């Protein structure tokens, strides 16, 4: 029975890089915000810098704007970490003849995203590899109606050989052909 069902866990937004950026943006945003407020009130709110000498109209306002923007972005990233957006699993079930793609979304009526496809509706397993400034290495579930459902999580791309091995192993398990997109 165990050789008929395969489940792959998908890590969502709870990755080290998101914790790092949320922390950095929070601290940096608060520092910029305090510097802008210090320039307006002429009270030094930062112990390591004298921000009372900043002119409020061009510099203080800009620092407050950037600080507010950075603070807001860090709150957004923290919310995605708290809700664990993008996590889930892919389940390949030969017993029920189904493939399930389950992901967590933002709170609301569509919090749990569930995509279910019968195995006879799947044409192949596809691999898309693009290099450059934003490299992408993605395994797709290619359906007969020409839709392509991504199966790999959004993260640092794996090596090409690892991705090809994963895709070949999945195609062999599901008895499907492998294609390059």
From Swiss-Prot:
GO cellular component: chloroplast thylakoid membrane; photosystem I
Membrane topology designation: Multi-pass membrane protein
Subcellular location: Plastid, Chloroplast thylakoid membrane
Transmembrane segments: 19-39, 61-81
Keyword tags: Chloroplast, Membrane, Photosynthesis, Plastid, Thylakoid, Transmembrane, Transmembrane helix
Domain of life per record: Eukaryota
Pfam families: Ycf4
GO biological process, one term: photosynthesis
Cited function: Seems to be required for the assembly of the photosystem I complex.
Protein's name in the database: Photosystem I assembly protein Ycf4
Protein's gene: ycf4
């Amino acid at each position: 029975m165990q050789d008929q069902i395969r489940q792959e866990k998908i890590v969502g937004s709870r990755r080290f890089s998101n914790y790092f950026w949320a922390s950095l943006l929070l601290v940096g945003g608060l520092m910029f915000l305090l510097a802008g407020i210090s320039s307006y009130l002429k009270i030094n709110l930062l112990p390591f810098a004298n921000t009372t000498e900043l002119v409020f109209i061009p510099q203080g306002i800009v620092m407050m704007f950037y600080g507010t923007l950075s603070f807001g972005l860090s709150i957004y990233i923290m919310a995605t970490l708290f809700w664990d957006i993008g996590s889930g699993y892919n389940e390949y079930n030969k017993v029920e003849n189904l493939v399930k793609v389950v992901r967590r979304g933002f709170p609301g009526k569509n919090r749990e995203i569930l995509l279910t496809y019968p195995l006879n509706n799947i044409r192949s397993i596809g691999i898309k590899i693009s290099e450059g400034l934003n490299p992408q290495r993605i395994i797709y579930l290619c359906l007969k109606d020409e839709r392509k459902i991504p199966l790999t999580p959004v993260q640092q791309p794996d090596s090409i050989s690892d991705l090809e091995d994963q895709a070949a192993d999945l195609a062999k398990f599901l008895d499907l052909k492998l294609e390059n997109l």
